[in-house]
């Protein structure tokens, strides 16, 4: 039987749709996949010896291609002036969209039918928003949806999951850090200190699993700067702490590290947990509440034939695919995962600007 693949589109528009989504098979597809990925890396470091299948190798090559496109689109306009997102990100985004079918072709060559119309849609939206030049948990969710589609197509198998996280996802994170640093992507939502990270959620979710069985390292260890410096390349959670500590210092004295309590109180609170296993469990609950359960985020989620839309959800309207926000927020105030917010420069952008203005200082200011 020939599969009929269709371009995924937005369907969720209101709280009634959100309730349907929360009880749907599509919701379970994403949540179960994330939980299975999390469970697959319990106790594993980023450099653990894992089986790298041919599909995983192709995924790593896909990310290499994304890196090449970044190199093709350097920042030249107002390079040292504007502290907001760099417009060259749009050139990067356009090139991704133009080349994504070719980039993804090796992944699907063995399939009878070509699903790239669906895969490319999630893939293209995994890097940020072209109009707002920002990035947040909704874009990260698109990358997970892309991987979930590969799993449903049989390209990624359960035995690939450890490699998908400690090789593929960590490489995706490296690509995203490069994009954030080069194009000064703004944090989607702009929740500042009340978020886990200006951009990401999942490295904390997967990273807590890596540490869940560690015999010595405790949650409060994130306050030990020397320990974080020694192990951040091995654990995603510590990489995020290292990244945050690096970009959030005092403008007057770049060498002066600020307390997590000051610039990341949520992470500071989480560090008081009794064990990483508790944090691992809590991260799933938080992901359900603050990402999959937030209308401003899932209003942007797209449904095709691989991840079908739940019955009863609002019909698709062409204007729902506007490149800008294109929705209201239902009159609600969101605690973490809002897709929109006051347009502010990222802490990373402030960091890079300070290096330009104060070349003799080390990074980096947080304002």
From Swiss-Prot:
It is found in: Cytoplasm. One of its GO terms (molecular function) is protein tyrosine phosphatase activator activity. It catalyses: [protein]-peptidylproline (omega=180) = [protein]-peptidylproline (omega=0). SUPFAM superfamilies: PTPA-like. One of its GO terms (cellular component) is protein phosphatase type 2A complex. Its EC number is 5.2.1.8. This is Serine/threonine-protein phosphatase 2A activator 2. It is an enzyme of class 5 (isomerase). PANTHER family: SERINE/THREONINE-PROTEIN PHOSPHATASE 2A REGULATORY SUBUNIT B, SERINE_THREONINE-PROTEIN PHOSPHATASE 2A ACTIVATOR 2. It comes from Debaryomyces hansenii (strain ATCC 36239 / CBS 767 / BCRC 21394 / JCM 1990 / NBRC 0083 / IGC 2968) (Yeast). Disulfide bonds: none annotated. PPIases accelerate the folding of proteins. It catalyzes the cis-trans isomerization of proline imidic peptide bonds in oligopeptides. Acts as a regulatory subunit for PP2A-like phosphatases modulating their activity or substrate specificity, probably by inducing a conformational change in the catalytic subunit, a direct target of the PPIase. Can reactivate inactive phosphatase PP2A-phosphatase methylesterase complexes (PP2Ai) in presence of ATP and Mg(2+) by dissociating the inactive form from the complex. Keywords: Cytoplasm, Isomerase, Rotamase. One of its GO terms (biological process) is mitotic spindle organization. Belongs to the PTPA-type PPIase family.
């Amino acid at each position: 039987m020939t599969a009929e693949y269709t371009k995924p589109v937005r369907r969720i528009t209101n709280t009634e749709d959100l309730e349907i989504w929360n009880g749907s098979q599509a919701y379970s597809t994403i949540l179960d996949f994330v939980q299975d990925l999390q469970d697959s890396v319990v106790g594993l470091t980023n450099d653990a010896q894992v089986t790298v299948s041919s599909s995983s190798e192709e995924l790593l090559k896909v990310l290499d291609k994304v890196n090449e496109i970044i190199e093709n689109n350097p920042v030249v306009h107002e390079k040292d002036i504007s502290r907001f997102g760099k417009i060259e990100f749009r050139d990067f985004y356009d090139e991704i969209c133009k080349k994504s079918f070719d980039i993804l072709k090796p992944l699907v060559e063995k399939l009878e039918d070509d699903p790239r119309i669906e895969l490319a849609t999630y893939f293209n939206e995994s890097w940020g928003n072209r109009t707002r030049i920002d990035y947040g948990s909704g874009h990260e969710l698109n990358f997970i949806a892309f991987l979930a589609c590969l799993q449903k197509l049989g390209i990624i198998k359960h035995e690939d999951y450890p490699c998908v996280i400690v090789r593929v996802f960590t490489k995706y994170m490296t690509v995203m850090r490069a994009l954030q640093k080069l194009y000064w992507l703004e944090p989607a939502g702009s929740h500042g200190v009340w978020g886990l990270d200006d951009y990401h959620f999942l490295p904390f979710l997967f990273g807590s699993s890596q540490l869940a069985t560690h015999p010595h390292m405790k949650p409060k260890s994130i306050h030990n700067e020397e320990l974080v410096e020694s192990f951040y390349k091995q654990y995603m959670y510590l990489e995020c702490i290292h990244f945050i500590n690096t970009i959030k210092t005092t403008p007057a004295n770049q060498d002066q590290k600020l307390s997590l309590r000051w610039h990341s109180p949520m992470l500071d609170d989480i560090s008081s947990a009794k064990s990483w296993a508790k944090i691992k469990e809590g991260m799933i609950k938080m992901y359900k509440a603050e990402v999959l359960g937030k209308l401003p985020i899932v209003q942007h989620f797209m449904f095709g034939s691989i991840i079908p839309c739940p019955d009863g959800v609002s019909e698709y309207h062409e204007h729902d695919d506007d490149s800008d926000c294109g929705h209201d927020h239902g009159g609600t105030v969101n605690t973490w995962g809002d897709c929109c917010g006051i347009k502010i420069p990222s802490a990373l952008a402030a960091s890079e600007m300070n290096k330009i203005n104060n070349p003799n200082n080390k990074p980096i200011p947080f304002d």
